[in-house]
Amino acid sequence: SGLVGSEMCIRDRTLLERAGCQVEVPNTQTCCGQPAYNSGDRTSAKDLARQVIDAFLGYDHVVAPSGSCAAMIAHHYPALFDDDPEYRGRAEALAAKTHELVSFLTDVLGVKDVDAAYEGSVTYHDSCSGLRELGVKAQPRALLGTVQGLTLTELEDSEVCCGFGGTFCVKYPDISTRMVSDKAKRVQDSGAGTLLAGDMGCLLNMAGRLKREGSTVRVRHVAEVLAGMTHDVPPIGDGTS
């Protein structure tokens, strides 16, 4: 399992080990290369992809707590190596065993419930890559439904982009700002005390907008709630904890 950041690593390792997995985090891993890929820099994207392939190919499964990273590996790596048969084969092998975290828990391991509690109401944003490239929609909701004390309030337009879109927010900042402002309004209109999602880029984007608007809505990665670690990890954007 490839994870970045100590809190993320502990959170995701906890979920995977509870499900019976032996988890390793190779030190040789690097960025998946998506920013370079989306910017048209195929040379840099291929260099990074080779490092990722070499770091992870020997594992049974590769799990990422980000739909965008998992989708990059699963759907875009093989085509990067159309002119390199050796790495094309390796990329295809890695793509076949790469999964988004919550999808892996439910669809591959068959996890039906989690041992966690969270008092309060939450709403859920469906990130573009997880939803559209990997089919992640029902899986997080199914597991959240087993968290003691949690009430899930569906977010209006939950499938609409938050405006982050990787390099999109840099290329089209005005459009991106309008989109995240609309998303923040939907979140606040939901009445939920906590916003959850499965992709850190989306979460950082939405947390920043909500904070600038003075909202008290907490923003968290869905895995923090599923792992029962909300008392150990501050909400995203909370600089006081």
Q: Which residues fall in each region the model found?
A:
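N-terminal glycine-rich anion-binding loops that anchor highly charged ligand groups
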Residues: 17-29
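Anionic-ligand binding region
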Residues: 130-152
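A short, acidic, amphipathic alpha-helical segment used as a generic capping/interface helix at domain edges
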Residues: 175-191
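Short, structured active-site "lid" loops
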Residues: 39-65, 172-175
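Short, flexible loop segments at boundaries between secondary-structure elements
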Residues: 88-109, 157, 213-241
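Glycine/small-residue-rich loop that forms an oxyanion/phosphate-binding "nest" at active or ligand-binding sites
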Residues: 56, 64-96
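Local cysteine-cluster metal-coordination motifs and their immediate loop/turn environment
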Residues: 6, 28-39, 64-75, 125-134, ...
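Short, small-residue-biased leader/transition segments that mark boundaries at the very start
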Residues: 2-4, 8-10
